[in-house]
Amino acid sequence: MAVPKRRVSKTRAAKRRTHYKVSLPMPVKDKDGSYKMPHRANPTTKEY
């Protein structure tokens, strides 16, 4: 089993964690002009 040779500093650990981000959902404009999530069925226009 791998064991770290030395302690990882708070700064170094934080720099590594900067890439763990949550991507924001990108809504798309529907035919009726409202913004919806992609790949979801729209109950008003009955479209996917």
UniProtKB/Swiss-Prot annotation:
InterPro entries: Ribosomal_bL32, Ribosomal_zn-bd. Residues 1-48 are annotated as: Disordered. This is Large ribosomal subunit protein bL32. Residues 1-20 have a biased composition (Basic residues). GO terms for cellular component: large ribosomal subunit. The gene is rpmF. Keywords: Ribonucleoprotein, Ribosomal protein. GO terms for molecular function: structural constituent of ribosome. Belongs to the bacterial ribosomal protein bL32 family. HAMAP family: Ribosomal_bL32. The lineage of its organism: Bacteria, Pseudomonadati, Campylobacterota, Epsilonproteobacteria, Campylobacterales. One of its GO terms (biological process) is translation.
